[in-house]
Amino acid sequence: MRTTSEVMFKAPGRICLFGDHQDYLGLPIIACAIDLFIEVSAISNESEMFHLVMPDLKTSRSFSIHESFNSLEKGDHFASTIRVLKRYGCFPNKGYSVTLRGNIPINAGLSSSSAIVVAWVRFLLITFGCSKEITHELIAKIAHESEVLEHNSPGGKMDQYTIAIGGMIFLQTNETASFTKIDSLLEGLVVGESGIPKNTLGLLGDLKEKALCSIETVQKHDATFNIAAATLLDIEKYIHLLPKELKLFFYAAIKNHL
């Protein structure tokens, strides 16, 4: 456990280069961290409370380091992270006053919320330790469990793994979550913000549901169909089995993967 009273961490936003909307289907993606960050600064407050301040959102909250969070409010990733980390042997034993701020645009598709979760996980693990070796992969795994699995959210693994590992990666988003770092620089790439808010969870939930439904419909007719091994020929072979409202999602699931 760290003995210094002040700690600072940061986590980047991310962009998807190839395979957008494929990670929740367990298909591979290529994504890249960007030079916009969420920063966490924390000072020991000699209490048994976490005091969180988020000036960019003009909000704050406090809770006991002993809080169990047996029930979760939707989207409360601070609480779900505490709950998940206890399963990994991470038990906070002193309070901190924590400030989270950053320059990643919110609701802009750059994973600001995942960056907050990754930074929060990293702070807690490094500060209080756990029963496993702390690696970038472990931080990504815990962040994914805290943000997605614990809330039954529709997202995949791309955001948490890209942000926690950093740089550019090729990621298998299936159960293995294996990755390869790509040692290349994307010089001159500019990310523009439209200013139009993105309803991430609502959009992902709808797209994931329809994509999975189209795949499951095909598998009812052919149990050997595997989206990870699908080719363009499979579109012609199976699309007639689908109702009109699912055909586009089946086409996209295969075409985007190739």
What are these regions (language model features)?
Residues 1-114, 118, 122-136, 163-168:
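ATP-binding N-lobe of GHMP and related small-molecule kinases
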Residues 22, 27-28, 32, 102, ...:
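Flexible, active-site-adjacent loop/turn segments at secondary-structure boundaries
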Residues 1-16, 39-76, 86-87, 170-258:
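C-terminal nucleotide
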Residues 108-192:
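Fold-level recognition of mixed alpha/beta catalytic cores in primary-metabolism enzymes, strongest
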